[in-house]
């Protein structure tokens, strides 16, 4: 199957592209350079959290930055963990830089790692190294970036924002409810999956690999979807929709939106429910 359609006027993608220029899927911190060790009693007020350690964290927003470790957390695990900051973000990481198989083995010796974290505000959250985060409080912010990698997990998201970027890779899992007044961008790849509900004025979806987006209750005004590989996306109702599918990807949506540019190639498919 190889079909292409176009419908005047100009592509709906233009509106989304202009609105999403200020959003980027780059990591909040591509390395730990610029971060220095910090004591729990002397942490600055932070607006971002980076967890690069296999630990379960409960995240509170709206109070002075602090961290409290579970009293039952094994001492050997606590000794392996280190806190760093660049003055804006709090980084939870390992004292020893590990890669590859060494990092994989380290996960098995760090079971029982738990903590509660408080940040003054939250504009960015990055999870890696099989970290798991539960957002305890609802978040109201002009913009938010959530970046997941590895086999990390995010739950409890209740967001009200002007702009929202979500990027997920590896076997990461996320879920939440969002209300986005302007631009919302959801990027998934690898075997990652996400479940979202709520509303986004301008929604852009990009899926690769075997990633999956389950969002039948996520509504949008203008929606753009780009899927490849064996990815799947289920989206709710919208006013206008444009899409480009390749590989064996699948897209399903609700309602009867105005259709803009459409491209379907390979064994990919689109269905309206």
Regions found by a protein language model. Give the residues of each.
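Short, functionally important structural connectors and interaction interfaces within domains
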Residues: 13-15, 33, 131, 146, ...
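Acidic (Asp/Glu) and glycine-rich low-complexity loops/linkers
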Residues: 26-148, 157-168, 175-184, 258, ...
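Bacterial N-terminal signal peptides
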Residues: 11-22
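Bacterial N-terminal signal peptides that target proteins for export
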Residues: 2-13
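Position-specific detector for the leucine-rich repeat
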Residues: 131, 152, 170-172, 192, ...
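Short, surface-exposed interaction patches in beta-rich subdomains
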Residues: 174-273
């Amino acid at each position: 199957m190889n079909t292409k359609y176009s419908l005047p006027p100009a592509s709906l993608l233009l509106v989304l592209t202009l609105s999403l220029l200020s959003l980027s899927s780059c990591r909040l911190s591509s390395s730990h350079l610029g971060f220095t060790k910090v004591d729990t009693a002397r942490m600055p007020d932070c607006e971002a959290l980076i967890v690069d350690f296999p630990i379960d964290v409960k995240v509170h927003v709206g109070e002075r930055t602090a961290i409290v470790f579970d009293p039952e957390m094994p001492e050997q695990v606590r000794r392996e963990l280190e806190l760093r900051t660049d003055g804006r973000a709090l980084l939870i990481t390992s004292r020893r830089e590990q890669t590859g198989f060494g990092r994989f083995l380290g996960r098995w010796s760090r079971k029982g790692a738990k903590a509660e974290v408080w940040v003054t505000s939250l504009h960015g959250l990055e999870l890696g190294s099989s970290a798991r985060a539960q957002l305890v409080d609802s978040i109201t912010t002009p913009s938010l970036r959530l970046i997941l990698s590895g086999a990390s997990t995010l739950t409890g998201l209740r967001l009200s924002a002007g702009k929202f970027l979500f990027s997920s890779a590896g076997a990461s899992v996320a879920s939440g409810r969002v209300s986005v007044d302007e631009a919302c961008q959801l990027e998934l790849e690898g075997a990652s999956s996400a479940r979202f509900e709520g509303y986004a004025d301008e929604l852009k979806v990009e899926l690769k690999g075997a990633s999956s987006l389950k969002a039948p209750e996520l509504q949008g005004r203008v929606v753009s979807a780009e899927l490849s590989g064996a990815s799947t996306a289920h989206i709710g109702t919208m006013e206008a929709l444009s899409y480009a599918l390749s590989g064996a990807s699948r897209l399903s949506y609700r309602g009867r939106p105005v259709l803009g540019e459409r491209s379907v190639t390979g064994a990919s498919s689109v269905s309206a429910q």
